[in-house]
Curated annotation (Swiss-Prot):
Residues 66-80, 88-106 have a biased composition (Basic and acidic residues). Residues 134-146 have a biased composition (Polar residues). GO terms for cellular component: cytoplasm; nucleus. The gene is Gprasp3. InterPro entries: ARM-like, ARM-rpt_dom, ARM-type_fold, GASP1-3. Coiled coil: none annotated. GO terms for molecular function: protein homodimerization activity. It comes from Mus musculus. PANTHER family: G PROTEIN-COUPLED RECEPTOR ASSOCIATED SORTING PROTEIN 3 (PTHR46414:SF2), PROTEIN BHLHB9-RELATED (PTHR46414). This is G protein-coupled receptor associated sorting protein 3. Keywords: Cytoplasm, Nucleus. Homodimer.
Amino acid sequence: MTGSKNKARAQAKLEKRASAQARAVAEREAANANRGAGKSRDKGKGKAGSKSDAVAEVKAGSKGKVVAETKEGARPESKALVKGTSDFNHRTENKFARSTRKDKPSSDNWFWAGEDSGINSWFWKGEELSNNSVAKCENKPSTSIQARAEEPAPRTSHKSRSGAEEEEEENVIGNWFWEGDDTGFDTDPKPVFKIVKPQPVDEINEKDRPKDWSEVTIWPKAPAVTPAVLGYRSQDSSEARSSSYIVLASNEEETSTACTKNTRSSLQSIPEYPFGSDPCIQTLDEIRQQIKIREENGIKPFACPCKLECYLDSPEFEKLVNILKSTTDPLIHKIAQIAMGIHKVHPFAQEFINEVGVVTLIESLLSFSSPEVSIKKAVITLNSSGDDRYNKVEFHVKHMCKETVSFPLNSPGQQSGLKIIGQLTTESVHHYIVVSYFSELFHLLSQGNRKTRNLVLKVFLNMSENPKAARDMINMKALAALKLIFNQKEAKANLVSAVAIFINIKEHIRKGSIVVVDHLSYNTLTAIFREVKGIIERM
């Protein structure tokens, strides 16, 4: 507020001095009648007029600035400023009253020569210091001052100019603010997110498959890992087939396959083959040569490019060829394709066919008169309900028990059947079916190898938990076979299963679930249990 006070004082001082000078000039004009006085009077009038105009202009400009600054400032300060201005006016009047008694020309020369330049320079310097921020923003102080001097600046016009300056100042500050904001922040920010790349999936590349048999090389002495040498179906449908090709599918299936290939692009959701793999048709000579290379070099069964394995040997392959030539059953041909590694299926099904033996499995299916019956025995519809499902499961259990005991001893097919029976006997509803095959199972327990005995003991352990099934296990033949398990050469898992079976039978007798009526049988049973207990303690 110091700058505003100085401006007010300077304004009052200039007004008083201008009025005093005007009165002095008027007195000189009336007193002096000569020519020199007239000239000096004319000169004084010109000077007084020009100076008074300049003072009026400065007065108007300074008043406008005072009004603009007092609007922004506080009201108590404006009151103090008015009081100080009135005091300053009284002092200046006394000074001018004394100065009029002195020499008038010297006063005029001092006022316009010295005080005018000093006051003006001091006034404009103070104004520039007080309005430094506005001058920096506008960068045109001389232009604004010149405009004020040229216009006669009434109070209303000054108010309108002040509003325009405020808008210009806001525009300048706003532009500066947003320009700074643009440099500090992104006007078009992009969203930040994590890109999840899909995991690569290994798929069969159709382009890498050989189109002709000439593109495949066969080594007579293959290394430990031999590349696949399987042939593929030719892309040309008009190509003639060799007479040594095996017909692995019926005519109807071949027709449906050709129709499906034509509509492959429009029906992607429908698989071309029911087992989910495009078959690889091979000649008999090619398959025989592959099996011969494998047997001569002693390497593992090598896979074709679609990662399917063939575990057939030469005699089994020749027998399978004769079977396929004698039947057109689609189920038999499909099983043969799986065994040859032509069709991709679930690993469990592939393992089951390899362990059972494809020739043995097909022979067992062909032993039935109707193909529909073999399909019912091989496939169980689990989504059926009621008596239909129960009858199918019962038929399946009987079929598995019959096939298992009919397989050769310790054969893969027999061991696979024992695995399935062990899973089926976890439910007591199937125990009455397995009980009828106890004599054959105890024979396998006494004559089979370690793996066969382990599988049979698992079946007996499941059935010993049922009192009705455990009652049929209490006979001399069964207990003698169980007692043979306890020797030093038996596997630990088999010993644990045998001990658990004896404990279950003992608990049923103790609880009264099994009642021994014959006294002789009871004494025999007690003697066997004491002998087994002694063997267990010694071990």
